[in-house]
Structures are given as C-alpha cells and as structure tokens.
Amino acid sequence: MPNLMDDAAMWDFVVDGYTVVHADLAREFHAQIHRDTEAVFAERGNVGNAILAEVPALAEVFDHSAVRGALTSILGPGYRFYPHRHCHLNTPHSAAQAMHLDSYEADENNRHHRARWALAFYYPHDVDEGMGPTSVVPRAQYHSTRPPDDETLFTGEAGSVCIVHYDSWHRATANLSDTPRYMHKWLFIRTEEPREPSWDHSPSFAPDYPATADLGSRDHGDMWANVWNWHCGREWEAKEDGGRVADLCVALSADLETVRLNAAYALGRMGGRAVAPLVDTLRDEAERRLEGNLAASMTNPSHLYSGYALSAVGGPAVPALTDELESDTWSIRAAAANILGDIGVAAEYAAPALAKRLGDAEPWVRRNAAEALGHLGGGAGEVVRGLGGLLADDVEWVRLNAAVALTRIGGEAAGAVPALESALDDDAYYVRANAAHALDAIGSPSAGGAL
C-alpha cells in the first residue's frame, strides 16, 4: 500500500514545491544500484533514457510505498512514468550549475501551476553538503523568472528521494569533494484530473495562509489556496467584489512577476464578475506578448497572466473561453484552448469545441487543444478520432501531445489503437514512447499486441 502524505505535508508541497521521502530498502540494495550506475558510466557513459534497462533495480525504488505514496498524493492514483529519465553525475571539484527550470522534452509546454507533472530525484548513496547536492528554491515553482537564490540543499542518506513540482527552480551545487555524486532523475505525469483529495485528508483540515494584501508579496496566499482547492477537486467560491477588476487587469502587465501572479489570483477570487474584462485582457495579451513568447526558449505562446487568472476563475469562464476558440486570431484560439485544459473538470463540456480545433491550421492551436483534451478526459468518438489523426501531424510536438492525451484518456481511446500502432514507428523517440504508453493505458488486446 502507498504511504500517503497527510494534509500538512501536502500543503507544504503546494507552498514549497517539493517533498522528501526515503525508500528504506536495504543499504546493500542502494549500494548495488550505485555500483551498477558507476559501471554503466565507466563502460558506456551517460545512457540517458536507457538507464532503466541498464539498472532495472531502479524500478523498485520508485515502487517503494513511500515514493508511491508521495506521487499518488501529488499526481493522483493513476499517475504514470513518463518515458524520460536521466542520471546526473556531478564530478569531483566541479562548479555549480546555474539555477534553471527544466524544459519539457521535445515540447514547449505551458508552465501550469497545477501539478500534472513531477520530477523525482533519487540518491543511491549518501550525499552531504560538500558533494554537490541538488538544490531547490522553495516557493518558486510558480515563477517563470529566476527568483532569489534562497535555495534548499537536498542532502540525505542512500535511498533519499526528493519529489518536486516540475517547474521548480533547481540546480546541481558545486561538488567540493573527491567523490562523484550520482542522482537519478525520473519524470511522472498525472493522468486524471482531481475530483477528491488523493492523500490522507481530513475534512477538518484548514490550510493557514496569508491573505495577499500586497501584490508585491512573495506570500502568494490566493494562489496557494487555488492550487490546494484544485488538488481537493473543488473550485473556490468567489469572495471579492468586482471594484478592483480594472486595476488588477492592468497589474497583469506589471514589471514584477510577483505582482502579475498575485493580481491574477486576486482576479480569480472574483469569479464570474471578472470574466468579461479578463477576456478583453486576454485578447490584448495574447497578441502583445506573442513575439516575445515565440522568441523565448522553453515557452509556449500561451504563457499569459490573464490565462492564470481565467484558470483560477474556473467554471464561470468556460462559456466565454469556448467562444474564443472561434477567434480569427490564432494566438487567442491557442490561449483559450490552453486555459480550458488547465481549468479541467469544470470545462469538460467544452470538449466538442476543443475537438474542432484539432484540425486548426495553426500547429500551436492543435498542440494546445490536444493537451487540453487529455486533461478533460472522456473518449467521445470525435475526440479520439481527432487525436488519432494528429499522430500523423507534420509537427513533432503536436504528435507528442496527441499521444500523451490518448494515454490520459486510457481505455476509452481504443478507437485510436491503429493510429497508435503506426506511431510506434515514428522517427521521434518521445512520440514512439508515448504511443507505447498510450497503448498500455488503453489495455485492449490489440493494444497489448502492439506493445
């Protein structure tokens, strides 16, 4: 049985972006993984995704009840391995890395605040502060600009596993020792939107968070509360009047990202009263920020602060966003698709409109619509046919997102099996690998044969 997190630990994850657990297997077990890892590096160098085939005992670490419990708590009971893993070697007397966010492999994902992706960092040997441990910046996982380097070092004995929100700022620190430091990094994804807490939750638990009175504060109380409610499978109730809407919409373009984020979630607090002015702001921001977003690395053109606000509004924003899927401007269509997917359960009835956008002339719209349909779930024929068709798209990251969406839909996506079987021969590794994962998730006899 997975050892689930309790409310306090889950709240800490929502706020800080990481949690540490221990796979308390025998020390000799971890020592053998360490020796096997060293042997792979000595004989073949860094084998990237093939490390599991070279060191199959790694699977037992991530199947440990403490690790499964934390991942279940954060990503839900249907979470899956993502087909990306990497062993990081920090050589003796090496310099520290720059603080960074990881890219999404072969994709330009939106950096959603809601935890649908997580990284796990595992040490097969003891790691102290002098050995170049990985560090994480607490409370920075919702920031796309580099925060102050108030980092926390992840140290611990063999078997220590740090699970982090995918968009956490992190780095390898300087290895001041004579000992090589190994860290196995694995990636996991959520396959089901939360409808209830997936951790050891008590209905009486009430998170203690500060009200966001100062838009420049790094205490993002409204944001944390919104993410917490999403994990609990509920939307928050609108609590503020609409008197500040205009000023807050202006603040979405402030120079300081903390101001933009706090303004977004203050607007989200206002519920339906904020939708019309936010949609106007979205139209402007989607065009105004387009050139910069396209030029930036690791950035989807729909990375918009009005988008975070509309996601936080939730259900009341769905009709207006569905209308924006018909915009003449592709960046607005792409943004609307992204936000509907981030809203999740409350936007499920927008699936037919999103399915129409799978045939959009603009690849960013197709990509965002495919991802959104994976979040919304449901295997309606038009959705599955559309996603299956995208597996032959000219653009790799469109095909990739179609395969991931079909993985999330799972058994209801059986109609896409022939297209998924063909995708097993795709030139792109992550398309092939995710097609195999989708076939496994479908679980039909024909899917098993394809695997």
Predicted segments, located by residue:
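Catalytic core of non-heme Fe(II) oxygenases with the double-stranded beta-helix
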Residues: 95-155
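Conserved double-stranded beta-helix
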Residues: 144-163, 168, 173-272, 280
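Structural detector for internal amphipathic alpha-helices that build alpha-solenoid repeat scaffolds
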Residues: 214-241, 258-273, 291-315, 323, ...
